[in-house]
Amino acid sequence: MTSLKLLKEKAPLVICITNDVVKNFTANGLVALGASPAMSEFPADLEDLLKYAGGLLINIGTLTDENWKLYQAALKIAEKYNVPAVLDPVACGAGEYRKKVADDLINNYKLAAIRGNAGEIASLVGIDVASKGVDSAGVDNIDEIALAANEKFNIPIVVTGEVDAIAVNGEVVTIHNGSAMMPKVIGTGCLLGAVVASFIGLEKGQELKSLETAMLVYNIAGEIAEKHPNGHLPGTFKVEFINALYEITDEDVKEFKRVK
């Protein structure tokens, strides 16, 4: 069974501790894809929910001291129940405090994957890449960045940009699908982190397969959305992207995928 069919069959509960700007978009995107999102931020509630969860997303976009404690509490509970956790270290290359939080979560808690742009992941491994807030300039060595992070942390790594790279157990693949409209809509990267959390726990020992499917489904949905008559407009693209996540099939992935 393909990872996409497995996701739709299992409809995994995905706990999303994410930034305030993107909660609605993230929840709608996961529902469209076939997952079941919960946006809980109360540790006692998380203790109950994570018993049944298929994934946890920690997105540090809206960072506060209290949220840092929440991330730590959620990761402890997730490890207790063997729930795969995905970290999105938003803008960790833009300031010392964010880098400190990201380092803490990576070094002291169990993670199933890290998802970030080239600037974010490069900052975690000490590679110099131009980064401005949540955005990162296009880079040529995205596969090297992914491999360096994978080797340093021994965690599956997803690095996104004009080309995306996935590194698992020293193996790297690059994804050449996607839409130039994605950066025009706030939250597309954050939703991707939640999509990764939805796929990562579907098949134990098949992380590369699951992550590759997650990236292809997401990026090809973006291409489909952009092809809409008004897909070049951010408002239309946002709506059509959700529609494409709802309608995308394995046949679409097989036909349009560009993987190296």
Curated annotation (Swiss-Prot):
Keywords: ATP-binding, Kinase, Magnesium, Metal-binding, Nucleotide-binding, Thiamine biosynthesis, Transferase. One of its GO terms (biological process) is thiamine diphosphate biosynthetic process. GO terms for molecular function: ATP binding; hydroxyethylthiazole kinase activity; magnesium ion binding. Substrate binds at M39, G187. InterPro entries: Hyethyz_kinase, Ribokinase-like. Its cofactor is Mg(2+). Signal peptide: none annotated. It catalyses: 5-(2-hydroxyethyl)-4-methylthiazole + ATP = 4-methyl-5-(2-phosphooxyethyl)-thiazole + ADP + H(+). Its EC number is 2.7.1.50. ATP binds at R115, T160. SUPFAM superfamilies: Ribokinase-like. The keyword Kinase applies. Pathway: Cofactor biosynthesis; thiamine diphosphate biosynthesis; 4-methyl-5-(2-phosphoethyl)-thiazole from 5-(2-hydroxyethyl)-4-methylthiazole: step 1/1. Pfam families: HK. Catalyzes the phosphorylation of the hydroxyl group of 4-methyl-5-beta-hydroxyethylthiazole (THZ). Belongs to the Thz kinase family. This is Hydroxyethylthiazole kinase 1.
